[in-house]
Amino acid sequence: MSKAKFERKKPHLNVGTIGHVDHGKTTLTAAISAVLTKAHGGEVKDFASIDNAPEERERGITINTSHIEYDTDTRHYAHVDCPGHADYVKNMITGAAQMDAGILVVAATDGPMPQTREHILLSRQVGVPHLIVFMNKCDMVDDEELLELVEMEVRELLSEYDFPGDDLPVIQGSALKALEGDPVWEAKVMELADALDTYIPLPERDIDKPFILPIEDVFSIAGRGTVVTGRVERGIIKVGQEVEIIGLRPTVKTTCTGVEMFRKLLDEGRAGENVGILLRGTKRDDVERGQVLAKPGSIKPHTKFEGEVYILSKDEGGRHTPFFKGYRPQFFFRTTDITGAVELPEGVEMVMPGDNLKFVVDLIGPVAMDEGLRFAIREGGRTVGAGVVSKIIE
């Protein structure tokens, strides 16, 4: 059948429902599945199967997440929904569910609640670029003014965290009524899908971003020079291009004189490929695992940053005891561990296993980083936490 083939050509986006407990995230997820599947085909996932989210492990952290897929006229979406607040925290910090956009669900009967605020803040911290709002349970509010008030409150809250609160789409609907097949409310789900299509820009593909390759191994090849191997994280590297070797020691510039994959010589290496890169005039001892090769000027090495962090619970194999100021674990970035000192925020004396917080890290050596880079926190090779760089300090 040629139809399925055509579908795959649609641009793909990752989205997810976020918001306060019992505001209707899972019901909305089921409603989107039902309404869009009716319109575009595909497999319907009902509320029970979404609510019964399977357990996954990401970097040793247990997360319950449901995944559904759906199509609109122009796009294909992968959508994640989590049953519990802790699952959202872990999901967003580990990047297990990278979101191009979040659908913030707010019950019109309640208005913004503590987790509404927390999820908006998390989205800002971990770099979810866009949010749109679905005001749910609007069938239960008769007062038009009350709906306007709730919408205004949500918009103000979003603006407080630097999202464009005045401009982003807010759809007033009822997930439950749409799920029950009421055409008036089904239309609101279609309106939400339309808002996703028109308001959320297509993310830049990895291949179009500036080249970067985290170095995993370094070899010396007699008569040819030094080869570094690793998986191209993003961008394209072509033979003859200049690259910088960044992190751990002073930045050096060199030229790529060869790209090989499975012992075959190539003209270029692309995002997602495992390649070996031959470097001109670079000695075996000038490069090490943990550095990155990157397009000159595209990324800088830093030692001090603010991270949004989740500390594993004892049950997840994390620490059994809290840690205090002066804590110095290793921070695993891309391919290597580097020691760093933790500065706890004002008023925080200790951090318990299972906690989520933001703190400042001072590394003993520079690492190539951008905001949004994920890392693990380790003690002697054992993962005890996960984090994301939310702000670079120096």
UniProtKB/Swiss-Prot annotation:
G5 as annotated region, ranges: 174-176
Residues involved in GTP binding: 19-26, 81-85, 136-139
Region (G1): 19-26
Location of region: G4: 136-139
One CC-aspect GO term: cytosol
Chemical reaction(s) catalysed: GTP + H2O = GDP + phosphate + H(+)
Pfam families in alphabetical order: GTP_EFTU, GTP_EFTU_D2, GTP_EFTU_D3
Annotated EC: 3.6.5.3
Domain tr-type G: 10-204
Keyword Lipid metabolism attached: no
Class of enzymatic activity (EC top level): hydrolase
Keyword Transferase: no
Subcellular location, record wording: Cytoplasm
Keywords recorded for this protein, A-Z: Cytoplasm, Elongation factor, GTP-binding, Hydrolase, Magnesium, Metal-binding, Nucleotide-binding, Protein biosynthesis
Binding site for Mg(2+): T26
Region of interest called G3, as start-end residue ranges on this chain: 81-84
Gene Ontology MF terms in the entry: GTP binding; GTPase activity; guanosine tetraphosphate binding; translation elongation factor activity
Span list, region G2: 60-64
Chief localization: cytoplasm
Protein task: GTP hydrolase that promotes the GTP-dependent binding of aminoacyl-tRNA to the A-site of ribosomes during protein biosynthesis.
Family membership: Belongs to the TRAFAC class translation factor GTPase superfamily. Classic translation factor GTPase family. EF-Tu/EF-1A subfamily.
Subunit details: Monomer.
Name the UniProt record assigns to this protein: Elongation factor Tu
Organism expressing this protein natively: Psychromonas ingrahamii (strain DSM 17664 / CCUG 51855 / 37)
Gene name in the database record: tuf
